[in-house]
Amino acid sequence: MTDVVSTEAPALSPLEALGQAIVANSAGAITAWSVAFGELNLLGPANRIVQALTYLRDHPDYRFHQLVDLTGVDYPERERRFDVVYHLLSLIKNHRVRLKVQTDEDTAVPSVTPVFPVADWFEREAFDMYGIFFDGHPDLRRILTDYGFHGHPLRKDFPMTGYVEVRYDDELKRVVYEPVKITEFRAFDFLSPWEGAKYALPGDEKAEKRAGDA
C-alpha cells in the first residue's frame, strides 16, 4: 500500500495571509512581505511610499491609522545604504506592520507628512541622525544636534568621539566649540562582559589584608 502524499500548500498563518493580501492589492506600491520574529515586514519602492502608506491607512481591511515611528538603518556596504523604516499600528484590527524602503545619500524619499502629520519630527530626526533627505517636507532641518553640527551621528562611519566638543568657557563667559582632543586612551579588554575591571583603587589593600587575617 502506497502512502498518499498531499500536494496542497501548507495553510498560511494570519500574518502571512495579511502580508500576501496587502501586496496583492497594493498595485505595486508594496512589492514583498516576510514574517520574522512574529512581526510582518513589508518592502516597497521609495518613490511610492506616499501611495503605500495611504493605501495601508485607508483600506477598510487594514486601517493602519497610526504611524508609531519612523527611523533609519545604515548599511554602508550597500549601494543604497539606508533603510527608511515606518512602523504602523491598526487599533481597529489589532495589527502592526513594518514597512521598509531603501535610498542612498543623494536620493530624497518623498515626505509622508501629508498622510501622517506626525511624521514631521520623525523625518527631521532621520535627516539629522542619518542625512536622509525627504522631498516635500515643510521644514527639513536638524532637530537634535546643535547649529552648524558636522556629520550625522547614527551613520556607521561617524566617529564615536565626534568631531567637535561643546563646552562652556568660564573665562569667555560663553559656549565654545573646539576640535575633539583625545587626552587619554583606555583599552577595555575583558574576558567576559560580566567581569569588572581589576583596577587598584585606594583602600583595596585594607580589604586584602583583612581577608588574609581571617
UniProtKB/Swiss-Prot annotation:
UniProt keyword annotations, A-Z: Cell inner membrane, Cell membrane, Membrane, NAD, Quinone, Translocase, Transport, Ubiquinone
Keyword Transport: yes
Locations listed in the record: Cell inner membrane
Main location group: membrane
Substrates-to-products reaction catalysed: a quinone + NADH + 5 H(+)(in) = a quinol + NAD(+) + 4 H(+)(out)
One GO cellular component term: plasma membrane
Membrane topology: Peripheral membrane protein
Molecular functions (GO terms): NADH dehydrogenase (ubiquinone) activity; NADH:ubiquinone reductase (non-electrogenic) activity; quinone binding
A UniProt-annotated Pfam family: Complex1_30kDa
E.C. designation(s): 7.1.1.-
Subunit structure: NDH-1 is composed of 14 different subunits. Subunits NuoB, C, D, E, F, and G constitute the peripheral sector of the complex.
Function description: NDH-1 shuttles electrons from NADH, via FMN and iron-sulfur (Fe-S) centers, to quinones in the respiratory chain. The immediate electron acceptor for the enzyme in this species is believed to be ubiquinone. Couples the redox reaction to proton translocation (for every two electrons transferred, four hydrogen ions are translocated across the cytoplasmic membrane), and thus conserves the redox energy in a proton gradient.
Family designation: Belongs to the complex I 30 kDa subunit family.
Protein known as: NADH-quinone oxidoreductase subunit C
Organism listed in the record: Caulobacter sp. (strain K31)
